[in-house]
């Protein structure tokens, strides 16, 4: 199959999960937390996108993003210092109202006009809380072949012994571990692929 990633826009949410590591993000965000003394968490997702042929990447920041800007610079290290596409760091304010976003839907609302101007047919969205090398090429090809509106990635990992029989309920989700002794759980890794027009249409319907 022809590499569809050249027709994909990458969107990264660098502040996701900041609230889970408050002591580490007093002066930075999740994406700029050091990893192995040499890298930052954003490096893994950004490099994965670039290595798969995605050359137009937007990082929608919310707060404490100066360290991220210092680290990324113009994007030259990733060959993203371009006149067309390249690396875009989007500030946390929309054109219609001055309000810092609190979630991914509001973050997308801040760049809605930007999305409308993009030429890419597909959008790949990711957080920066996982250190991994991910094959976005395979994911997007599977997305196109399936004809799905949205494709989400997950991984399988063992469930710790102490939580295999636990149940938790929150305002956001319900999940149960190992009612029948199951030892493997499917964990959503917050990587998504969709059509760019679908992304815009869903916001206009539900969020505008």
Q: How does the language model describe each region?
A:
Residues 1-208:
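Unchanged
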